[in-house]
From Swiss-Prot:
Biological source species: Shewanella loihica (strain ATCC BAA-1088 / PV-4)
GO terms of molecular function: ATP binding; ATP hydrolysis activity; four-way junction DNA binding; four-way junction helicase activity
Region (Disordered): 1-27
Top-level taxon in the UniProt lineage: Bacteria
First-tier enzyme category under EC: hydrolase
CDD domains xrefs: AAA (cd00009)
Protein's recorded name: Holliday junction branch migration complex subunit RuvB
Gene name, Swiss-Prot/TrEMBL: ruvB
Subunit structure: Homohexamer. Forms an RuvA(8)-RuvB(12)-Holliday junction (HJ) complex. HJ DNA is sandwiched between 2 RuvA tetramers; dsDNA enters through RuvA and exits via RuvB. An RuvB hexamer assembles on each DNA strand where it exits the tetramer. Each RuvB hexamer is contacted by two RuvA subunits (via domain III) on 2 adjacent RuvB subunits; this complex drives branch migration. In the full resolvosome a probable DNA-RuvA(4)-RuvB(12)-RuvC(2) complex forms which resolves the HJ.
Length: 337
C-alpha cells in the first residue's frame, strides 16, 4: 500500500481546491484558538510578548515532532501574533544558494521565513543560512571564475522557523543556531475531540460529544488525521444517516474505513503481525522488518513506528523491534513466555 493512499497517514495529501479551503478554515489563527500542546503554547506566549516589548524580531525557532501535529499552523500563528508577514518554502525546494537569497532579500523587518523539512536543505544552501541567521548578513558570489567576488548584503532582522520530523538529521551547526526549540507531542483524546468539534462547526456538521470523542480516539493523536477522518465520517453520515454524527454513526463510518479502535489501519496491523507471526514477537532488525512487509526503512522509522512506540505496541531495543504484550492483546493473541 502506498503511504499517501492511507487515510491515517499524517503527511498532507494533494487535495482539491475546496478541501484546501476547508483545511485553511479549520486552522486556528491565534494562540488562544490553538488547542493542546500546553507547554509549547505557554512558552510561545512568553517569547512573543517579550519580543514585542523589546520591539525585536522573535528568535529563530525549530519546531519538530511527528507529521500532522501542527508545525505549519504554529508558524502561521507566530506570524499572526507578531503582526508580520510569513513566507513559506521547504528544504527540497531550495536547491541553489540563489533560491534562498531571493527569499531573504524580500523579507521586511520582523518577517517570518518558514522552511518545512529543513533537515533536507542542501549543504550549499545551509552555508548561506548561517550568517543570515547569526548576523543578518547574506554572503553571495557575483560572477564566475577568476572574476568572481563575494559581496555582503545586510538583511533586516527576521525570524527563521524551521520544521522537521527528523530533528536528529539536522547538522549540529544548524541546530545550534535556533534559540527556541519546540517539540510537539501526540495529542490526547480530550484535546483532539475539541479540535474535531471545532472543525465540525467549520464543516457545518452536527456532531455530539461522543461522536467527536470516537473520531478523536481513532485519529492517532494527530489533528491532520482527525480532520481527514471527520470529512469521511461526514460523507458517511450524509449518505447512510440524516447527516448528524453520534457515537454509533462515527463507529460505523470508521469501521467501514478499516480504521480500528486504536486508529490502526492495514499497514499498522501488517507491521505488528509481521513481528508477531514472522519473527516470533522479535527482536527483529529494521532491514528484515522492512523486507517482510515490503516497505522502506524510512517509512517504518518516520511514519509507522512513532505512534506504535508511543502507544506501547512496539519496543525498540539494541537487538531490534519487539512486539509488546499490548500488541498481542490487540489481536487477542497469547504472548509466548
Amino acid at each position: 500500500m502506498i503511504e499517501a493512499d492511507r487515510l491515517v497517514h499524517a503527511q498532507p495529501q494533494g487535495t482539491e481546491e475546496r478541501d484546501e479551503q476547508i483545511d485553511r478554515a479549520m486552522r486556528p489563527k491565534l494562540l488562544d484558538e490553538y488547542t493542546g500542546q500546553d507547554d509549547t503554547r505557554a512558552q510561545l506566549k512568553v517569547f512573543i510578548e517579550a519580543a514585542q516589548k523589546r520591539g525585536e524580531a522573535l528568535d529563530h525557532m525549530l519546531i519538530y515532532g511527528p507529521p500532522g501535529l501542527g508545525k505549519t499552523t504554529l508558524a502561521m500563528i507566530v506570524a499572526n501574533e507578531m503582526g508580520v508577514n510569513i513566507k513559506s518554502t521547504s528544504g527540497p525546494v531550495l536547491e541553489k544558494a540563489g533560491d534562498l537569497a531571493a527569499l531573504l532579500t524580500n523579507l521586511e523587518a520582523g518577517d517570518v521565513l518558514f522552511i518545512d523539512e529543513i533537515h533536507r536543505l542542501s549543504p550549499v544552501v545551509e552555508e548561506i543560512l548561517y550568517p543570515a541567521m547569526e548576523d543578518y548578513q547574506l554572503d553571495i558570489m557575483i560572477g564566475e571564475g577568476p572574476a568572481a567576488r563575494s559581496i555582503k548584503l545586510e538583511l533586516p532582522p527576521f525570524t527563521l522557523i524551521g520544521a522537521t520530523t527528523r530533528a536528529g538529521a539536522l547538522t549540529s551547526p544548524l541546530r545550534a543556531r535556533f534559540g527556541i526549540p519546540l517539540r510537539l507531542e501526540f495529542y490526547n483524546v480530550k484535546d483532539l475531540s475539541s479540535i474535531v468539534t471545532r472543525s465540525a462547526k467549520v464543516l457545518e456538521l452536527p456532531i455530539d460529544q461522543e461522536g467527536a470523542v470516537e473520531v478523536a480516539r481513532r485519529s492517532r493523536g494527530t489533528p491532520r488525521i482527525a480532520n481527514r477522518l471527520l470529512r469521511r465520517v461526514r460523507d458517511y453520515a450524509e449518505v447512510k444517516h440524516d447527516g448528524e454524527v453520534n457515537k454509533v454513526v462515527a463507529e460505523s463510518a470508521l469501521d467501514m474505513l478499516d480504521v480500528d479502535v486504536e486508529g490502526f489501519d492495514y499497514m499498522d496491523r501488517k507491521l505488528l503481525l509481521a513481528i508477531i507471526d514472522k519473527f516470533m514477537g522479535g527482536p527483529v532488525g529494521l532491514d528484515n522488518l522492512a523486507a517482510a512487509i515490503g516497505e522502506e526503512r524510512e517509512t517504518i522509522e518516520d511514519v509507522l513506528e512513532p505512534f506504535l512506540i508511543q502507544q506501547g505496541f512496539i519496543q525498540r531495543t539494541p537487538r531490534g523491534r519487539i512486539a509488546t504484550a499490548r500488541a498481542y492483546q490487540h489481536f487477542n493473541l497469547i504472548q509466548p513466555e
